[in-house]
């Protein structure tokens, strides 16, 4: 027992000696309070004897240019170098729901769900994911009204594997009966989810496009209609793919890669490859130009029980009012983007903060003044041949008429005097949002791909910022006044008992003050 106590005491003494020694060299000389080594030196002055720090300079210019090469088969290869060991590479295709006029609506929706399934070289989606996993990669496919995008983010060292895989996924999908049946179920579930979701924004966006461009181009269904789910099969998909998945309608875009290496991979895997639907022959591409019609789409629905949790959500009626703006190829696109930011808006219970837009018009004039308004948000959708600026508002069904009048007044005010302070705030917020978004590699990839797909080149961020800075109050007034001369598009969802007629909404937007015409009832 005595031996054990003696050994423990010796061990503790040894530990104390070890702890007393400095772990890394000699202890630093530090003094505090009045005995400081550098007395009376304010924090704003550099310490004597300390090397001056060298800070990075910011000139607002991109360090790497966007390079574009067009191959012999018409495929465009675009790249933007970026620091880091990871890259984002993908294929963007000029296809989407706007090109389905001669087909069943919903093909693009099906292709989005079928992406990265079995191909000529890969037996299943799991095999594709395992291949990407070796390079730390993930994949995704998104379709919109005018673009389909297949993208992979992975280690830059695996660029060859990634481009090879993308080529196989895009050009050689198997589209087995089992996969198509699973896709039918996935589409059905997504449609059910859209109708049950408390946030109606995706559904309203679909409705406002249908109202604005009735049965043409961007007004065609973005989501597959229920009646078409069972009708879409491999033959229909191959017919669509043959016409729209051609090299001249594609861009291979990459961020964080060397341009020459990406071009080499494109030539190796995407030139001369025969797709699964056969050799390309005569194609039948829909080149229709969007025709804005205006109009109204109404969906009567009981919104009193959409809560998915224990906290009840109040019954609301949702209205979206829109007017035709311009395409992203026009010079007026930038003033419209600034106008949209100036309108801003959001939800009535959204937490504020710097850059949140709490001084935008829809907050100051609508949400702050009318406590019963639950939402007022401005959206701007722009395409290669048209655009749509709209305001989404939500309120209790009993106050629908008043809500619509408030929105029509805000549209009228767009064409009136623009305050310089609010304009500068909107321009600054738009530029900061642009630059912050472009700090993300996948966002840069999408920006490069979409711009090159539409214009064969890319405007760099500092060029866009210059255009934003040059927007004047008269530009906002001019584009707003031109927009207000068109017919409105209206989408309404919920209890629509007190919804004004389309003719009354159109009259309010044509008036000087935005007031709805009085409605008279013989019986109350």
UniProtKB/Swiss-Prot annotation:
Disulfide bonds: none
InterPro entries in UniProt: Metalloenz_LuxS/M16, MPP/UQCRC_Complex, Pept_M16_N, Pept_M16_Zn_BS, Peptidase_M16_C
Positions bearing N6-succinyllysine: 63
Pfam families reported in the protein's UniProt record: Peptidase_M16, Peptidase_M16_C
A biological-process GO annotation: protein processing involved in protein targeting to mitochondrion
Keyword terms, alphabetized: Acetylation, Membrane, Mitochondrion, Mitochondrion inner membrane, Transit peptide
UniProt-annotated location(s): Mitochondrion matrix; Mitochondrion inner membrane
SUPFAM superfamilies: LuxS/MPP-like metallohydrolase
PTM annotation (N6-acetyllysine): residues: 298
Tree of life domain: Eukaryota
A GO cellular component entry from the record: mitochondrial matrix
Molecular function terms, GO-annotated: metal ion binding; metalloendopeptidase activity
First and last residues of the transit peptide: 1-33
Broad class of where this protein is predominantly found: mitochondrion
Signal sequence segment: none
Keyword Acetylation tagged: yes
Purpose: Substrate recognition and binding subunit of the essential mitochondrial processing protease (MPP), which cleaves the mitochondrial sequence off newly imported precursors proteins.
Similarity remark: Belongs to the peptidase M16 family.
Subunit structure: Heterodimer of PMPCA (alpha) and PMPCB (beta) subunits, forming the mitochondrial processing protease (MPP) in which PMPCA is involved in substrate recognition and binding and PMPCB is the catalytic subunit.
Protein name, as recorded: Mitochondrial-processing peptidase subunit alpha
Species lineage: Eukaryota, Metazoa, Chordata, Craniata, Vertebrata
Name of the gene: Pmpca
């Amino acid at each position: 027992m005595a031996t054990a106590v003696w050994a423990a005491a010796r061990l503790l003494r040894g530990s104390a000696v070890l702890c007393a020694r400095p772990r890394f060299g000699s202890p630093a000389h530090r003094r505090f309070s009045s005995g400081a080594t550098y007395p009376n030196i304010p924090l704003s002055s550099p310490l004597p004897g300390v090397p001056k720090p060298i800070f990075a300079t910011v000139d607002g210019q991109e360090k790497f240019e966007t390079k574009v090469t067009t191959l012999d088969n018409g495929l465009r290869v675009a790249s933007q170098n970026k620091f880091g060991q990871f890259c984002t590479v993908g294929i963007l295709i000029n296809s989407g729901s706007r090109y389905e006029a001669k087909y069943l609506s919903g093909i693009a929706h099906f292709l989005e769900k079928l992406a990265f399934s079995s191909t000529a070289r890969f037996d299943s989606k799991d095999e594709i994911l395992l291949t990407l996993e070796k390079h730390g990669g993930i994949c995704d496919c998104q379709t919109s009204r005018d673009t389909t995008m297949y993208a992979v983010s992975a280690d830059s060292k695996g660029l060859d594997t990634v481009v090879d895989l993308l080529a196989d996924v895009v050009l050689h999908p198997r589209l087995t009966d089992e996969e198509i049946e699973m896709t039918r179920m996935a589409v059905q579930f997504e449609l059910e989810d859209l109708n049950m979701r408390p946030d109606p924004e995706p559904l309203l966006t679909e409705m406002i496009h249908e109202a604005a461009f009735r049965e043409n181009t961007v007004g065609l269904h973005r989501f597959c209609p229920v009646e078409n789910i069972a009708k879409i099969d491999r033959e229909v998909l191959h017919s669509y793919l043959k016409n729209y998945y051609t090299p001249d309608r594609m861009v291979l875009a990459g961020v964080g890669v060397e341009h020459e290496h990406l071009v080499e991979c494109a030539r190796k895997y995407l030139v001369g490859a025969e797709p699964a639907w056969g050799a390309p022959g005569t194609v039948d591409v829909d080149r229709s130009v969007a025709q804005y019609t205006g109009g109204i789409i109404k969906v009567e629905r009981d919104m009193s029980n959409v809560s998915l949790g224990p906290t009840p959500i109040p019954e609301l009626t949702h209205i979206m009012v829109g007017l035709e703006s311009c395409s992203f190829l026009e010079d007026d696109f930038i003033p419209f983007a600034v106008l949209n930011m100036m309108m801003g808006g959001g939800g009535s219970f959204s937490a504020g903060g710097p850059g949140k837009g709490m001084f935008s018009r829809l907050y100051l004039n609508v949400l702050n003044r009318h406590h019963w308004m639950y939402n007022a948000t401005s959206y701007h959708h722009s395409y290669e041949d048209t655009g749509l600026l709209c305001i989404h508002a939500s309120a209790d069904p009993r106050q629908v008429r008043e809500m619509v009048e408030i929105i029509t007044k805000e549209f009228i005010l767009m064409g009136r005097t623009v305050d310089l302070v609010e304009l500068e705030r909107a321009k600054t917020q738009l530029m900061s949002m642009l630059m912050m978004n472009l700090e993300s590699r996948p966002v840069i990839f999408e920006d490069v791909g979409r711009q090159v797909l539409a214009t064969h080149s890319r405007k760099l961020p500092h060029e866009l910022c210059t255009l934003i800075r040059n927007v004047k109050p008269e530009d906002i007034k001019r584009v707003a006044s031109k927009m207000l001369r068109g017919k409105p598009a209206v989408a309404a969802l919920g209890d629509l008992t007190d919804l004004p007629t389309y003719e009354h909404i159109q009259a309010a937007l044509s008036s000087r003050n935005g007031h709805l015409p009085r409605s008279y009832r013989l019986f109350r």
